[in-house]
């Protein structure tokens, strides 16, 4: 996916662990901006039967991503720009706000 985005001229950001090498290379080496979460390979911590899941790299990467999004939103507000924040459906009025955002950005962002 990163290579496809780069080929299309999109600036890429990767959050990964340098300890794990997949697909014959290191994702962090190919991204324009690379953030190493520093989690060692084999980081699954929850045993489910004979398997392990719940990799700490996932938690670390999502923490990093959310921190970036929060700081970006704060900086936008400080500059007088209201960022389009998708709201939890568990928050009162969240669903209505999200529908308005989906209508505004229809065609640009596909619904999951």
What are these language model-derived features?
Residues 1-70:
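Glycine-rich phosphate-binding loops that contact phosphosugars or nucleotide phosphates
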Residues 35-38, 72-76, 80, 109:
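Structural signal for hydrophobic packing residues in well-ordered secondary-structure cores
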Residues 43, 73-100:
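Internal, active-site/partner-interface "lid" segment
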Residues 62, 66, 89, 108-109:
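Generic signature of intrinsically disordered, low-complexity segments enriched in small/polar residues
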Residues 95-112:
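C-terminal and late-domain segments of enzyme folds
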